[in-house]
Amino acid sequence: MRCKFCICYNYTDAEHTTELSITNASMSTSAASSSTSTVAKQKQQPSEIKDKVRVLCLHGYRQNGDALKNKLGSFRKFAGKYAEFVFLTAPHQVILPETGSDQAAEQRSWWANKDDGTFKGTNKGGPAFGFQESLGFVEEAWDKQGPFQGLLGFSQGACFVGLLCGLAKKKLTSIRPDFAILSSGFLSGSLAHKSAYEEIITIPTLHIYGLSDDIIPKEMSQDLARHFKNAEILEHPGGHYFPATAAQKQTYINFFQDRLQEYLENLELQQASNVTFLETADKQTAVDSSDSNDSD
């Protein structure tokens, strides 16, 4: 049974912790066999992937990867049977608004949207200082620490996940998520980010927000969710945090069960395609060998 706080909408009206070869027909049979063997090794790599989906996680403003990992302890227990989570720490130190200094080494930010180098989710029309560096940082993690299937973000991290999904839709990033979880997310008000929301995003997403959130009001999270066609909504009665109680447990389990099933089905199809490719390569090798013998 789905959680009583979980309400599903389909918006059809608007679409571990870290700091971060071609063969010639005249080729001999042995050489062709060697080439086929090399291709086989390359094509068999997906079978080595674990039977869990892997999720890259992005923390909120003034947090870091360890902080988010600790806060998601219960959530990770709920979903750990189906998913593995890797937590990144943003490359930028937070500038403390009280002093204008960057002495809060453990407090990190993905970008700043105010002229004083700080960030506020409700700010509109501001800059996006440091965003490109963070984008490159996450793209490198996605490539070097992958493969990953999904993204998860909280607060500013969820805003970032929304931007990454939009950029992926427009093929403006090397990141290609199959799904995403966005908790206390919102649309970025930075002018440089407006184009990321031009297309409706179709991957499955879970949007989580608190009805009493006074940092990112629920309306801001709802506005973000409207840009996703296959959005599942999980409301909770609390404030600005990632909920993980018995009331949300089944929603998380159901979501990750579905994503794991989709991942395994796609993996099976890919492996079947690889077998067909290898069978075709073997037949071509036999034909090339026969043609070579005839010419002798």
Where are these regions (language model features)?
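Serine-hydrolase catalytic machinery in alpha/beta-hydrolase-like enzymes
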Residues: I49-F148
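Short alpha-helix in the alpha/beta-hydrolase fold that links the catalytic acid
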Residues: N70-G73, K194-S195, P217-R226
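Active-site nucleophile loop of the alpha/beta-hydrolase fold
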Residues: A90-P91, A180-G189, G238
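Acidic catalytic loop of the alpha/beta-hydrolase fold
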Residues: G189, L211-I216, H240-Y241
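Short beta-strand/loop motif that positions the catalytic acidic residue
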Residues: H207-Y209
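Catalytic histidine neighborhood in serine/cysteine hydrolases
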Residues: R226-P243
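Post-His helix in hydrolase/transferase enzymes
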Residues: A244-D258
